[in-house]
């Protein structure tokens, strides 16, 4: 599933996460898999091999995937489908949560 976050900060990083039967494989890259990008540009993708870096990326993805205010997923017809929040649960806005996460790590 493709999840997009459309909010204050412009983001272009692509993270691919494959469960791989309990042994997660993560990759970082620049392409967004559009035809013009794959055939007319040079794009790069690299595996994440360091266990600490891998865990940090998984933590970051967890924050982003919990977004219930500015996140949407792309359906099979390439339409944006906005996530709906449960009325009783906190409505996470991941870019601000992510900012606080990084701020705490640097203090």
Where are these regions (language model features)?
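PLD/PLD-like phosphodiesterase catalytic module centered on the HKD motif
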Residues: 1-107
């Amino acid at each position: 599933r493709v999840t997009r976050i459309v909010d204050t900060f412009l983001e272009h990083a692509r993270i691919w996460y494959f469960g791989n039967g309990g042994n997660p494989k993560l990759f970082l890259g620049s392409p967004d898999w559009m035809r013009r990008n794959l055939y007319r540009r040079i794009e790069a993708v690299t595996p994440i091999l360091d266990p600490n870096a891998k865990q940090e990326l998984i933590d970051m993805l967890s924050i982003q995937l919990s977004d219930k205010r500015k996140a949407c997923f792309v359906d099979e017809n390439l339409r944006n489908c906005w996530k709906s929040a449960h009325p009783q649960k906190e409505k996470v806005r991941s870019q601000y949560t992510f900012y606080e996460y990084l701020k705490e790590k640097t203090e």
